[in-house]
Structure formats: structure tokens, C-alpha cells
């Protein structure tokens, strides 16, 4: 009752990174609230799944193991969470802002007449004063995300309804094991009690999972281009520089919208979150939604001819100049000094 819950996405028998990241954050939230962290695993052949989950500080793992629960389909997983939450009455539920999370989250929140904030970039605990009603709500979940095209950062609260639900993209939170020997309780539920047979009406006949074309999230060096790159050809310079530095190339939303780069290279609140050791921003102004996806980089270098570009305020080093001037010189330098 009144605990923090995390829904675990599972591919085969492997828990997704985004879910493990949310367990790390959920553990911190539970500590602040003085409650337990619980997780929900729904899939097939899940024996031993607790070995992946409990080390993140999970006090209770709810396991729903049945052939009809993998691959994911909407109705069975919705019934699992809706009926479990009616029993357990969590105060917070977190899930990944993935294809599955974007389908499952709204279904569950609607059925429980709760609210949901999508694509949060930060989650905190705090108080809220409703001056109109003259009420003060303590220990609410601050669901923080950019809004209005990234021009402001909104803090959203859900004072009255439970659970407070939020989705978070992969990479936004850090994944950290709490204790490899953490002792938590594992509960194997009777799936038939929670999921009616009619929920299995949709069956997945075949699946095709494509591998990622690049490793933007895990790259130690990321070179990102913005609208200031001017064209798709401008991005060719970044790929040439990336080849010399053994880096990956990313892009801002403006550059992707302009057709300069593919969407899977987009960095920011509506793209990938990265934490490289070195982040080189080329022709990027630095809207809030972009900064949300790279602000925890080790060293940030901004190449920009606008001294007042917002990204310069968080950059460790600023190179004032056009990308057409600076990047060719960098390429020439690294080519001449590489072995």
C-alpha cells in the first residue's frame, strides 16, 4: 500500500535498461517517502528474473508468468497493472517512455482515473500549495518536463488521484546497482486471477526486431549538429570529423526537422539522452528540450558564431566562429596528428 511501483519491460527474459534506470530512481524516491519499492514483471519463462531486479533495491517483485504475456500485447498487460494496482494502491508508478510505455501508461491511468505525465526529464518529491482551495499537499511527485516546444520547463503535480504516473525515456536516469545481495520478496501471481481469457484475443504471429544502426547512447564522444549546419551536406563534415575522433554523430530536433539528419540521431527530450565524456555541439542554439538530453555530458564544447546562444551557458569551452570555418580546421588537425 502507498508504495512506489516500476513496470518492467522485458524482451525475452531480459529486463530493459530503461526499466533498470527507473528502479534506480524509484529506490531514491521510495527512500525520500519512507516507503517500499515494488516492481512488476509480466512475460513468459521468467524464472530467475529476480536476479536482474532485486539488486536495484527492490523490496517486492510481482511476477506474472504466462505464455500469453510475451510478446507484449495491450489488453493482458493493462489488466495485470489495473487489477494489481486496485489491490496494492501504489502512490507512484513509473514506466519507460517507449512504444510499450506509451501504449500501456494511458490505458492504466485512464482506467484508474489518474493522470500521467509523458517524457519526464526529472522526477522529484516536494510539496504543493493550492492557494485557490487553501490546501497544502505534502510529498507529491514533481513530474518535470519541457513544454510548449521546449520554451519552458513545466513542473506537473497530481494532488488528488493515485497513482501518480510518469513515463521517462531511456538514458534520462542513471542505472546504478544498490546492493548485489539485496534481499527482496518475490511474489508469483496467478495470472488467470488478473487477466480474463478474452484479453488474449490479439496474438502476435511474427516479430521483426531491427538492431540499432549506431551506438549514440553509449558513445564516449558525441558530435552533434544543429540547424546551424545549414544542410545535409554540412552534416557530412561532422561524419568526417567523427571518423577521426571515433565518435558518433547526433543532431538537434531543428536539424532533424529540416531533414539534415535521421530521426534516430536526435538528441533531446524527444530523442535520445546521452552522457558522453565529450560532447561537441556544432551550430546548436541550445533549446531546453535539447539540453535535457545532453546536459550531463562530461565536457561540453560549443562551436557557434552566436556568443549569446543558450548552449554556451552550460558549455565548458566555447569556440566562437562558424562551423564552416572551425570544423574543417579540426578535421585537418586530427588527420595530420593521427597515427
Give residue ranges: language-model regions.
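N-terminal glycine-rich FAD/FM-binding segment characteristic of electron-transfer flavoproteins
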Residues: 1-339
Amino acid at each position: 500500500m502507498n508504495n512506489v511501483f516500476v513496470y518492467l519491460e522485458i524482451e525475452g527474459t531480459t529486463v530493459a535498461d530503461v526499466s533498470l534506470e527507473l528502479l534506480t530512481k524509484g529506490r531514491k524516491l521510495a527512500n525520500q517517502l519512507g516507503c517500499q519499492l515494488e516492481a512488476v514483471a509480466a512475460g513468459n519463462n521468467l524464472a530467475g528474473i529476480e536476479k536482474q531486479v532485486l539488486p536495484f533495491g527492490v523490496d517486492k517483485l510481482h511476477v506474472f508468468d504466462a505464455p500469453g504475456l510475451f510478446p507484449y500485447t495491450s489488453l493482458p498487460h493493462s489488466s495485470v497493472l489495473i487489477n494489481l494496482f486496485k489491490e496494492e494502491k501504489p502512490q507512484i508508478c513509473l514506466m519507460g517512455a517507449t512504444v510499450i510505455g506509451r501504449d500501456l501508461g494511458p490505458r492504466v491511468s485512464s482506467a484508474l482515473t489518474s493522470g500521467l505525465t509523458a517524457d519526464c526529464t526529472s522526477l522529484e518529491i516536494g510539496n504543493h500549495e493550492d492557494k485557490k482551495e487553501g490546501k497544502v499537499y505534502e510529498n507529491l511527485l514533481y513530474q518535470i518536463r519541457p513544454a510548449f516546444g521546449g520554451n519552458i520547463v513545466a513542473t506537473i503535480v497530481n494532488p488528488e488521484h493515485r497513482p501518480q504516473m510518469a513515463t521517462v525515456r531511456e538514458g534520462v536516469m542513471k542505472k546504478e546497482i544498490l546492493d548485489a545481495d539485496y534481499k527482496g520478496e518475490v511474489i508469483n501471481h496467478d495470472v488467470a486471477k488478473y487477466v480474463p481469457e478474452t484479453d488474449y484475443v490479439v496474438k502476435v504471429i511474427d516479430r521483426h526486431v531491427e538492431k540499432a544502426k549506431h551506438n549514440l547512447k553509449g558513445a564516449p564522444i558525441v558530435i552533434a549538429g544543429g540547424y546551424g549546419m545549414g544542410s545535409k551536406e554540412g552534416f557530412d563534415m561532422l561524419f568526417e570529423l567523427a571518423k577521426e575522433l571515433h565518435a558518433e554523430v547526433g543532431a538537434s530536433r531543428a536539424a532533424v526537422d529540416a531533414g539534415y539528419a535521421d530521426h534516430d540521431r536526435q538528441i533531446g527530450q524527444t530523442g535520445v539522452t546521452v552522457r558522453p565524456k565529450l560532447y561537441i555541439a556544432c551550430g546548436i542554439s541550445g533549446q531546453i528540450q535539447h539540453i535535457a538530453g545532453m546536459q550531463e555530458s562530461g565536457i561540453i564544447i560549443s562551436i557557434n558564431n552566436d556568443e549569446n546562444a543558450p548552449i554556451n551557458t552550460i558549455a565548458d569551452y566555447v569556440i566562437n566562429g562558424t562551423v564552416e570555418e572551425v570544423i574543417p580546421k579540426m578535421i585537418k588537425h586530427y588527420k595530420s596528428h593521427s597515427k
